């Protein structure tokens, strides 16, 4: 069941759901807007001959932070990692779904490639997979609305929420745009 604005506010008031910093003006009828943080991870296209999900490739990306008051420019065809300004903490019976903002999609900005689902129990800044599919550069301003978080109530609390030892939660507590850790649980057959 998708939570309404009333339910979102009740979960935050009960301190079961946390988005810090919280701004009540960001609550929408069935979602809450999230804003863009100021850190980005850009890909180093000359460090490796290819990307291998089975390998740890520490120099695949570089952390970039625009100067105060300046935007990050995302060029056509470029893919970078960003993150939400908000630290998001979900209880064991709520899952999240990150969706892009329609107004930004109409400009050619994709907010996430595939990883729009947030497990119950997750706590951290949500990493964004930002792509420019337009023919012109797009300026990304720190603090701008970048997506909307929809919240879904589970039929019962998760037995092993994200962050529990049984799950192997590679991104719990992440701060800023976090590079892939796919190598940690990659299985070669």
Swiss-Prot record:
Q: Where is this site: Important for bifunctional activity?
A: 116-117
Output the CDD domains linked to this UniProt entry.
trimeric_dUTPase
For bias kind Polar residues, which ranges apply? Answer: 171-189
**Catalytic activity of the protein:** dCTP + 2 H2O = dUMP + NH4(+) + diphosphate
Entry GO MF terms? dCTP deaminase (dUMP-forming) activity; dCTP deaminase activity; nucleotide binding
Q: What Pfam families does its record include? A: DCD
HAMAP family the UniProt entry points to: dCTP_deaminase (MF_00146)
**Name of the protein in its database record:** dCTP deaminase, dUMP-forming
What's the encoding gene here?
A: dcd
């Amino acid at each position: 069941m998708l939570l309404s604005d009333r339910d979102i506010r009740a979960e935050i008031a009960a301190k079961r759901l946390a988005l810090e910093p919280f701004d009540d003006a960001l609550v929408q009828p069935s979602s809450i807007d999230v804003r863009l943080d100021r850190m980005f991870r850009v890909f180093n296209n000359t460090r490796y001959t290819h990307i291998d999900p089975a390998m740890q490739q520490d120099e695949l990306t570089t952390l970039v932070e625009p100067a105060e008051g300046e935007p990050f420019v995302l060029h056509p065809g470029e893919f970078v990692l960003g993150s939400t300004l908000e630290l998001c903490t979900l209880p064991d019976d709520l899952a999240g779904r990150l969706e892009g903002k329609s107004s930004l999609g109409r400009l050619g900005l994709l907010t996430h490639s595939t990883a729009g689902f947030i497990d119950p129990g997750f706590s951290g800044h949500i990493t964004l997979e930002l792509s420019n599919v337009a023919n012109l550069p797009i300026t990304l301003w720190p603090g701008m609305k970048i997506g909307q978080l929809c919240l879904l109530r589970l039929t019962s609390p998760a037995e092993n929420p994200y962050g529990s030892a049984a799950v192997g939660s590679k991104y719990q507590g992440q701060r800023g745009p976090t590079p892939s850790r796919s190598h940690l649980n990659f299985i070669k057959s």
